[in-house]
Each structure stands twice: as structure tokens, then as C-alpha cells.
């Protein structure tokens, strides 16, 4: 047990899917897993363990932003010995290379947060995912006929008041979208010798101002959930 997770040791499987929204975690458990069991609920940040095609897998919410995400990731790795962490979330596209409903695999994560500089003695950390997880995601997407978009994301501490004039510069450097956690997830996994990857479904396009309806968000997220579960099975 930790200050933020009240699961018992052994409740988590070595593979864990992460979502910012705990209600989305509950949705995945009820719709996609067999024998799903709630294992933690501190602060209503829900976690479940169950089976997908006979293989054990866990789910955990992590809240919004790097600070919240890294708390849960650290505790999952250090206390519960989770070895593979796959974040599945939404993002806002900033590149013409991607559109609504596209699934992005974040091969690198820049950030305006100072957390990685603090942990890396004020140097720039190359926040990148695990190669083997990335390869599995890419190969699974090919098998499922999913056109997986591959590129960098920008993990921002800001949801509002972001510097929108920077979008063109980010796109120039092959940043496909903005989200809020990948840079912290990758850095924490690197520090603690775990494997991590972030997949994001495009729910909004910050350049064209297009956005998915609530129904379309659910449908597009389901495709990413299936990809995530298949690559971990």
C-alpha cells in the first residue's frame, strides 16, 4: 500500500494500461476485460486487474499532468513491480500530418515542465519510450489495419493559456500533438528501469479547430484500447 494506491502487493499484473480519467479506466475494465476486479480507489483514482484473452493485465488512472502521473507511475513501479506501462489518452493535434481519430505513438516527448531538468541536473533529457514496446505497438497496428501515426508530442503543464504561436515551430520539429503526461512518464520509467509507451487518440485539432463529438470520442478511443490490449496480450 502507498499514500495514493490502496491495492495489496500482488494485485497489479506486470503490465498496466494508464489513463488520466479514472472513469475511463472503469469503462475499459467493464467493457473489455474478463474477471475485472477493482483493486484501488484512493481519491477515486480507480485501478482494476482482470484478463484479456486469458492474459492478466491491470488498469490505473493517473490524473492530469506530469506531477500527478509521475506519482502513480513511481508507486506502480517501485511498490507494485509493474514492468510495462502503456498510457492511452487523448491529445490535440498541431500538425497537418494527423487528423481527428488518428492514433499517435509518441516516439519522443518535449515539455515546458521543468521536472525532467530537475531530475537530470538541469540538462535536457531525451524523454523517449521503450523500443520493444514501440515495436510491438507498430506491428500490432499493422496487423489490425490501423494507420498508426509516429512522431513526437509536446507535454505541456498548461491546458489553458498555452502559447499557440509555438504550434508551427513544434510541427516543424515533427511534433504531432500536445498532451500533458508523456515526458514525465518516459523520464520516470527511464529512471526506474521500467518500460513505457504513450499512445494518444486525436480528439481535437488545434490548428483547424475541428473536434470530435462525444460519441466519436468514445468510438475512436475504443480503437486505441483494442490496439493497446492486443499489443500487451
From Swiss-Prot:
Listed GO MF terms: purine-nucleoside phosphorylase activity
Question: What's any one GO cellular component for it?
Answer: cytosol
| Gene3D superfamilies in alphabetical order | Nucleoside phosphorylase domain
Q: Which Pfam family, just one, is annotated for this protein?
A: PNP_UDP_1
Q: Where are the transmembrane segments?
A: none
Q: Does the keyword Glycosyltransferase apply?
A: yes
Q: Which residues bind phosphate?
A: 20, 24, 43, 87-90
**Gene Ontology BP annotations:** purine nucleoside catabolic process
Its UniProt entry gives the catalysed reaction(s) as: a purine D-ribonucleoside + phosphate = a purine nucleobase + alpha-D-ribose 1-phosphate; a purine 2'-deoxy-D-ribonucleoside + phosphate = a purine nucleobase + 2-deoxy-alpha-D-ribose 1-phosphate
| EC number(s) given by UniProt | 2.4.2.1
Has the keyword ATP-binding been applied to this entry? no
Site feature (Important for catalytic activity) residues = 217
Leading EC class = transferase
Recorded hits in SUPFAM superfamilies, A to Z, give:
Purine and uridine phosphorylases
**Which keywords fit this entry according to its UniProt record?**
Glycosyltransferase, Transferase
The residues responsible for catalysis, as annotated, are: 204
Alphabetized NCBIfam families for the sequence: deoD, PRK05819.1
Alphabetical list of HAMAP family matching this protein: Pur_nucleosid_phosp
What this protein is reported to do is described as: Catalyzes the reversible phosphorolytic breakdown of the N-glycosidic bond in the beta-(deoxy)ribonucleoside molecules, with the formation of the corresponding free purine bases and pentose-1-phosphate.
Which family, according to the similarity comment? Belongs to the PNP/UDP phosphorylase family.
The protein here is known as Purine nucleoside phosphorylase DeoD-type
Organism, per UniProt? Helicobacter pylori (strain ATCC 700392 / 26695)
Phylogenetic classification of the source organism? Bacteria, Pseudomonadati, Campylobacterota, Epsilonproteobacteria, Campylobacterales
Amino acid at each position: 500500500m502507498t499514500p495514493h494506491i490502496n491495492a495489496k502487493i500482488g494485485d497489479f499484473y506486470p503490465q498496466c494500461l494508464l489513463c488520466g480519467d479514472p472513469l475511463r479506466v472503469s469503462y475499459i475494465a467493464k467493457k473489455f476485460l474478463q474477471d475485472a476486479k477493482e483493486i484501488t480507489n484512493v481519491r477515486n483514482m480507480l485501478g482494476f486487474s482482470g484478463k484479456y484473452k486469458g492474459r492478466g493485465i491491470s488498469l490505473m488512472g493517473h490524473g492530469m499532468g506530469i506531477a500527478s502521473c509521475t506519482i502513480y507511475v513511481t508507486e506502480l513501479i517501485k511498490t507494485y513491480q509493474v514492468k510495462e506501462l502503456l498510457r492511452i489518452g487523448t491529445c490535440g493535434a498541431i500538425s497537418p500530418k494527423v487528423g481527428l481519430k488518428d492514433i499517435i505513438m509518441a516516439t519522443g516527448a518535449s515539455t515546458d515542465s521543468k521536472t525532467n531538468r530537475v531530475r537530470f541536473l538541469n540538462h535536457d533529457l531525451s524523454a523517449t519510450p521503450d523500443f520493444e514496446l514501440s515495436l510491438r505497438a507498430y506491428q500490432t497496428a499493422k496487423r489490425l489495419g490501423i494507420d498508426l501515426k509516429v512522431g513526437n508530442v509536446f507535454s505541456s503543464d498548461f491546458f489553458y493559456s498555452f502559447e499557440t504561436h509555438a504550434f508551427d515551430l513544434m510541427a516543424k520539429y515533427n511534433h504531432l500533438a500536445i498532451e500533458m503526461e508523456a515526458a514525465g512518464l518516459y523520464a520516470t520509467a527511464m529512471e526506474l528501469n521500467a518500460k513505457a509507451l504513450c499512445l494518444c487518440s486525436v480528439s481535437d485539432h488545434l490548428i483547424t479547430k475541428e473536434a470530435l463529438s462525444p460519441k466519436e470520442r468514445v468510438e475512436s478511443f475504443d480503437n486505441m484500447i483494442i490496439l493497446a490490449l492486443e499489443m500487451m496480450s
